[in-house]
Amino acid sequence: MKKILTIILLFLSTSILSANERDAQLDKLFNELKKNTSSSSSSIAQQIWTLWSTHPTDQKLTSILDEGSRLVQDQKLYKAIEVFTKAIELDPSWAEAWNKRATVLYMIGKYKESQNDIDKVLNLEQRHFGALAGQGLVNIKLKNYEKAIE
């Protein structure tokens, strides 16, 4: 029993370290993004998207998010919402799951629900430029033009 607890604690500490390393990587990339020219900015932004879209500790959740993204590409939007909701239920602290669902909600015209999810994203990751852009689009659709400019 003691050996099993040791293994579990070792696994959990490795997962926590991975999440901390991921946060450090994001901080580094955002600092680079601030300093770089537009020619290298898209490469840095893509690296950030990759980190956001990869769950820090659970490959199964990454696979669920990928499945939802495939459903969006296939225009199966309501099914995609179900899949993204499942990812949110499994880890409500994963900003990208909220962001993906917010995007699909926007696509089907559920702007207030999309804004609610965007608020969650920005509470979890205030630098999420995808959510910030989405927030502007939602505010335009809701005719909140002053907020859209912010």
Language model features by range: what are they?
Residues 54, 73, 107-108, 141-142:
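Register position in tetratricopeptide repeats
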